Design a protein with these regions (language model features):
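Post-cleavage N-terminal segment of exported redox proteins
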Residues: 2-60, 87, 97-162, 188, ...
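N-terminal, post-signal-peptide region of Sec/Tat-exported proteins
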Residues: 49-80
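Conserved short C-terminal alpha-helix that flanks the catalytic cleft of nucleotide-sugar-dependent
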Residues: 67, 167-168
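C-terminal cap of thioredoxin/glutaredoxin-like
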Residues: 166, 173, 181-187, 199-211, ...
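Short Cys/His-rich "knuckle" micro-motifs
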Residues: 88-91, 189-193
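The canonical Cys-X-X-Cys-His
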Residues: 74-86, 136, 164, 175-186, ...
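Short cysteine/histidine-rich metal-coordination sites, predominantly Zn2+-binding motifs
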Residues: 93-102, 195-204
């Protein structure tokens, strides 16, 4: 079954012209960058634009409740330290992943939330890709909606950005493709009826209609890696955080959209 699926996907890629490009990919120029929103149909755009119709906003509302709820042995809520998220969290998600000095490596926003739970609330971490973590992340990220992505400038991050870029450019898996072959070289094409976008992470966590739920950027990355029939990574793996870091640096200056809606 896996072999047959691989052949089918390879055939779709050939039909789309995705494997008929030069071996050396070309990075997208700044002036050509486009949010995934611009590739969507009018109904999907309208759903994202209207907060009363955007299903991702339900998750963000749940996140607001979690923000104000006391948790852990310390009996603290996020609001006890950070106050009103609409002020204190403005622009925060636009800077993540960020460097964590005690760990000596970058952490994404979900990991920062769980580190805060452990360090300050003395609470158990939220499991990856479960509703509570996605909802609280969406609520925090929503406070940066409309603000430009502004990656953490810490010099300590630069080696990790380089690792993320190497991952994005490197061909891998049974299909022998890199992220760049689809998202730099072929973003003007379609694959299985869906547009191939430029992979700018402007709206995560997103509400994806295919999933019928909120989902993280790492969920999307893992889906892509599975599609290449390549070795995958656990949620929170350093390799995925490094890739997130590179993608955010690649999207520098683009406006945040969380919670975005995608097909």
């Amino acid at each position: 079954m896996k072999f047959g699926t691989t052949i089918l996907l390879a055939s779709l890629l050939v039909t789309a012209g995705i494997v008929l490009r030069p071996l050396i990919a070309t990075e997208i120029q700044s002036a050509e960058r486009r949010s995934g929103y611009t590739f969507m149909g009018p109904e999907t755009k309208a759903m994202q634009d209207d907060d009363t119709a955007n299903p991702g906003m339900l998750g963000a509302l749940d996140g607001e409740a979690l923000w104000n709820r006391k948790a852990g042995a310390a009996g603290k809520a996020c609001a006890d330290c950070h106050g009103d998220a609409r002020a204190s969290m403005k622009g925060v998600a636009a800077r993540y992943p960020a460097y964590d000095k005690p760990l000596g490596r970058p952490v994404n926003l979900e990991q920062r939330i769980n580190l805060c739970r452990a360090r300050h609330q003395e609470a158990d971490p939220f499991p990856y890709e479960k509703h509570d973590l996605l909802a609280l992340t969406a609520f925090v990220a929503e406070q940066s909606r409309g603000m430009p992505i502004a990656p953490d400038p810490s010099p300590e991050l630069q080696p990790f950005v380089a690792k993320g870029r190497d991952f994005f450019m490197h061909r891998q898996g049974q299909l022998n493709l890199g992220c760049t072959n689809c998202h730099d070289d072929n973003w003007d094409k379609h694959l299985a009826g869906s547009p191939v976008t430029q992979a700018h992470p402007t709206g995560y966590p997103i509400y994806r209609l295919e999933w019928q739920s909120l989902g993280s950027l790492q969920r999307r990355l893992r889906n892509c890696i599975n599609g290449l029939r390549a070795q995958n990574f656990d949620f929170g793996a350093p390799e995925l955080v490094e890739l997130e870091l590179y993608l955010m640096s690649r999207a520098r200056g683009m406006p945040m959209e969380t919670p975005a809606v995608r097909p």
